[in-house]
Amino acid sequence: MLEVALKLLEEITACGFKAYIVGGFVRDYILGINSNDIDITTSATPKDIKEIFEDSCLPSEDYGSVTVIMKGIRFEITTFRKEIGYIDNRRPAEIKYIDDLYEDLLRRDFTINTICMDEEGKIVDLLNGQEDLKNGVIRTVGVSKERFEEDVLRILRAVRFATILDFRLDSEVIDAIKDTRELLRGLSYNRKKEELDKIFGSSNANKGVELLLGLGLDKYLELDNLSKVKCTSSLIGVWTVLDVLDKYPFSANERELITACKEALNYNNLDPYTLYRFGLYANSVAGEINGYDIKEITETYNNLIIQAKKDIDITSKDIMDALGRGPGSYLKEIYGDIERQILSGRVVNEKSRILEYICSKY
């Protein structure tokens, strides 16, 4: 991927423009972390890029970005720019194309994200980002408070980078976050969740939770249960404890899983019927939160006599024929009873034995 990106840079520079890989990819490259997201910054305008690459697309010329596809790989190319004014502490009110890399880098968030790579693969570091990488520091470009007021999402990005990279926040960054954290109330829940997913889904999530609490961000993110969070191997487990389905946006699948996990939290996650009712995933997530041994939960689940309704050796028609009745809500009641009886070992999961039990009781 890097070879393709460098080839792309060569094609741009061959036309008389400056072009560099910038941001997260270069940062991760220096740290020895694999990355598949390459951003390119250039003195060429979107119009110039479109003339150079015939197969490029132009989704938003207003923001000076073009997506170029080379050898099946998508590259985001952004023109050097200066941002003038900000709207809603999130978006620039106006952008002005410029021809200076240094000035372009001054608008960016953190020094570690300003390191560039040229078409020869050489590192270009105009703001000493490598020094902060070496020292494990998250430092803003310029005055921290101004950077956060320009774009409040940067507060969560600071926490994310400190969490994922296991870096520390610069003292000025900490003070500025505390001064501007109330602006998080105006940030969309979609944006907040995107960043929080990355923080809570990190292998270093405990640090992320500690930072959010230490900076007092739980109040402004409306995460009242954050202090109760026990970071699990599942992101769903964190959201289950946070209990914010009524505030934050979740997919239908996430909602279903969180709801099941939340219910399973109230039961013994080694109980056969609980395992059968909520399934292995929900019980594993809830069990980890409740302090159960996940291996024991898995073994118990795998040894269940039945794991789903389809495993029961009887059909609704069998029940109706045995009782001489038609369809009705009573079938659900009987099935629920049968499930408990089989899982407890009181009734053998054989058609004749199940029918014998049903006929004697109903």
PLM region descriptions:
Residues M1-Y362:
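Catalytic cores of the polymerase beta-like nucleotidyltransferase superfamily
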